[in-house]
Structure formats: C-alpha cells, structure tokens
C-alpha cells in the first residue's frame, strides 16, 4: 500500500522539536532552490538576463566602434596620402561636377562651415558625463583633469584658422588694382588671389581626430557593470580580489559610481552613436574637399598642421604622467586594462609523461569533431582543465598540486630504477 509522500519542502517555521524543524528529517539541503541571491555565499553573482533592446543597442555600439576606432595611425596616413594623391589628380584632371562641388550644398552650409560647433555639441556632454562617471562623481577632478582638453582643442582650432586668414590676406592680391584688403576686394565684386591654406580640410581632420580620441572612454565601458557586481560580492563576503580595478575605491565612491553608471550610461551611449555618425560625415565631406576645393599644397599643409596638433596633444602631452590634463579614459580606477582570467602559468614540472612525448612547441587537443586542434601554447605551460574549466583557483593550490605530482613522479622513477637493479 502506498504511503503518503513526504513534502519536498517541509515547514521551516515549525516549532522546535517538531519533525519539520529537525535537520535529521530533512531530505534536502537547507535553503533550497528559492534562496535569494543576497543570501548566497561563496559563488560569484551572475549577470542579469539581457533584453532584446539591450542586445540591439550593443550591436549598434559595436558597429560604431568598428567605424570610429579604425586604426588611427593608418587613418592618419590615409588622410595625408589621400590629400596628396587625390588633390594632384584633381589639379590636372578636373573631376565631374556633382552636388558636392557646389559651395552652397546642404552639408557644406549647415555642417562643414560650423563643423567645430557640431563637434563640440557631441564631445562636450560626452566628455563631461563619462569623466564624471569614471571619477566617481568628483566634479573638481573632472573639471581640472579632463575638461581642459576641450578648451585646448578649441584654442588650436581658433589659432590655426585665424592664422590661415592672416596668411591669405598678407600674401594675396586683388585681381583689380586699388584694393589692398581681401574684404574690400570681395565687397567690390572682384577676386582675391592668395595662398589660401584650406581651413575646411583642417577643420574636418582636426574634428575627426578629436572625436576619435575623446570617444575612447567607451572602450570596455560595459565591463564597469561587471566590476561593480563582482566588487559588491567581494565586499559582502569579505573576499580580497587582486584583479578588480574597483578594489581601491571607498564605499562612498562605490555608491557614486554605481548610481552614475546606471543613470548616465544610456545618455553616454546615445552621444557616442552621434559622435561616430558625425565622424563618418566628416570623412565623407573631406573627400569632397579633396576633389573640388583648393590646390594640393594648400590642402596638404592644412592636413599636416591638423595631424601635428593631434599628435602633440593626444600622443605626447596628455599621456605624459604628471601633466594636466589627463588622457581620455583616466579616472579613479582603470577599467580599460585587460585582466587575465588565470593570472599565473602552469609550472613546467606539472607536465606529465604524455606531455614529454609531444613534438614541437605547439600542443594538440581533440575538438568535438575528433580532429586535432592546435592550442598555440606549449604543453608545459598549459593550465590543467576539466570540461574547459581550470582545476586550480589560486597559485597556492596549483603549487601544491605541482609538488604532489612531482613527488609522485620521482617515486615512480625510483621504483623503476630499483626494479632495473634487481633484475
């Protein structure tokens, strides 16, 4: 005769001494599957499920990163090479006239002529919000260490464009005698011929390079969320992590970072998408400038000046330790550094007898199709794994296992030598 089934989850709120409150009568581990995440101990929290909207946004962000973070050194070389080659061809073989050849085209009138204003429209809020977040709400550090970059970039834009006008006015002449200045010559309906260094080419290249450099804080921005989650777990369980970049932050900084990251990340992502689209537009308009405006030497000189300005500021000045302002992405913690998932190598004496028989420095594994897959890592430096996960979670455990294997191997060798001598 069938008996009554025991409940899968007895009443834990029973009185002391009742069968339901006795640990010996439980057929499961206390806590059960419905234990809350905040009550769990000993395991790292997992990421929350990702929504479809989040996946689509991250896909757009990924495409924008591919566009704007194209190899900068190669892009600079392409700028100079294109300015020279395309401009030389255009000087000798006129290109067919298109809509972009008209100086009153929509893009030239409403974008290029006020190009620096469009650049500041996206760069300033992006810089302020991203720097304010990675400095954990320290507005003084943001204003002192990051905002001056925009002031410096604006100063160089103003200085060089004004200098170009001075050069043109000083070394030019009117097609009709009697007019000493460019303004009076043009006002009378005549032409002013001078050395007109291309302000359009300078503004487009200068704006593009500033957009690229100031957008760099978005690199690995998503990892901040993971760092916050793991650091909260470490602090709740009194664990010490030697790799989490947030471990040096105090509790107030952690709260500020968590709040600002959650509130400002959607705005920062939107601004970044706008910056990537604007930088792509500047590249397209630069091609139009190469094809239809100015002479080759005027465009090449302006391009060289824009690139030298970028190199002096973003490659020499800002990365230099001790000088202000700081480079984009610097803050109260470093989140753009690659953190090794397994920070130590397997000792060479962990290799087994099978490892010594492998040929070459590359070891082979068997993939799901039964074929040998080359790992590219020497066998004696591979980390022991089980089902793809490392067997050891700390250097101490790895060293203990290594010593155990080494002593066991030495014992077997001594036994073999003893058997050889006896025979």
From Swiss-Prot:
Consequence of gene loss (knockout): RNAi-mediated knockdown results in loss of auditory sensitivity. In the whole body or specifically in muscle cells or fat body, results in locomotor impairment, uncontrolled and uncoordinated wing movements leading to flightless phenotype. In nociceptive dorsal class IV dendritic arborization C (ddaC) neurons results in altered branching and dendritic field coverage in third instar larvae. In fat body reduces lipid droplet size with aging. In all neurons does not show any of the phenotypes above.
Bias-annotated ranges (Low complexity): 351-367
Cellular component terms (Gene Ontology): endoplasmic reticulum membrane
Segments passing through the bilayer: 76-96, 114-134, 147-167, 192-212, 271-291, 300-320
Feature: compositional bias, Basic and acidic residues: 409-423
EC number from the UniProt entry: 3.6.1.-
Function: Fatty acyl-coenzyme A (CoA) diphosphatase that hydrolyzes fatty acyl-CoA to yield acyl-4'-phosphopantetheine and adenosine 3',5'-bisphosphate. Preferentially hydrolyzes unsaturated long-chain acyl-CoA substrates in the endoplasmic reticulum (ER) lumen. This catalytic activity is required for maintaining ER structure and for lipid droplets (LDs) biogenesis, which are lipid storage organelles involved in maintaining lipid and energy homeostasis. May directly bind to diacylglycerol (DAGs) and triacylglycerol, which is also important for LD biogenesis.
Protein name, UniProt field: Acyl-coenzyme A diphosphatase FITM2
């Amino acid at each position: 005769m069938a008996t009554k089934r025991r409940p899968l989850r007895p009443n834990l709120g029973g009185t002391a001494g009742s069968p339901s409150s006795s640990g010996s009568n439980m057929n499961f581990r206390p806590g059960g599957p419905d234990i809350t995440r905040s009550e769990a101990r000993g395991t790292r929290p997992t990421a929350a499920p990702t929504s479809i909207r989040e996946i689509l946004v991250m896909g757009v962000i990924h495409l924008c990163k591919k566009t704007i973070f194209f190899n900068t050194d190669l892009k600079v070389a392409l700028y100079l090479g294109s300015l020279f080659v395309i401009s030389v061809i255009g000087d000798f073989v006129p290109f067919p006239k298109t809509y972009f050849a008209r100086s009153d085209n929509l893009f030239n009138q409403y974008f290029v002529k006020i190009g620096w204003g469009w650049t500041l429209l996206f760069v300033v809020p992006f810089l302020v919000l991203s720097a304010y977040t990675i400095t954990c709400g320290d507005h003084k550090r943001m204003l002192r260490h990051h905002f001056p970059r925009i002031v410096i970039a604006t100063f160089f834009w103003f200085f060089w464009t004004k200098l170009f006008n001075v050069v043109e006015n000083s070394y030019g002449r009117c097609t009709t005698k009697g007019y000493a200045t460019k303004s009076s010559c043009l006002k009378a309906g005549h032409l002013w011929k001078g050395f007109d260094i291309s302000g359009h080419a300078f503004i487009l290249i200068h704006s593009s390079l500033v957009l690229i450099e100031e957008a760099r804080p978005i690199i690995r921005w998503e990892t901040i969320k993971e760092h916050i989650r793991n650091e909260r777990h470490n602090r709740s369980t009194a664990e010490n992590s030697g790799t989490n970049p947030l471990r040096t932050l105090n509790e107030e900084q952690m709260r500020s970072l968590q709040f600002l990251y959650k509130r400002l990340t959607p705005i920062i992502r939107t601004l970044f998408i706008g910056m990537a689209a604007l930088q792509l537009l500047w590249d397209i308009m630069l091609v139009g400038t190469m094809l239809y405006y100015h002479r080759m030497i005027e465009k090449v000189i302006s391009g060289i000046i824009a690139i030298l300005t970028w190199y002096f500021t973003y490659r020499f000045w800002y990365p230099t330790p001790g000088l202000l302002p700081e480079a984009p992405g610097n803050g109260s913690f470093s989140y753009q550094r690659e953190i090794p998932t397994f920070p130590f190598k397997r000792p060479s004496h962990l290799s087994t007898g099978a490892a010594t028989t492998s040929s070459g420095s590359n070891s082979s594994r068997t993939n799901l199709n039964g074929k040998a897959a080359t790992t590219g890592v020497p066998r004696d430096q591979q980390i022991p794994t089980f089902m793809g996960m490392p067997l050891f979670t700390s250097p101490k455990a790895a060293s203990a296992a290594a010593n155990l294997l080494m002593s066991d191997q030495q014992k077997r060798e001594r036994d073999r030598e003893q058997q050889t001598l006896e025979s």
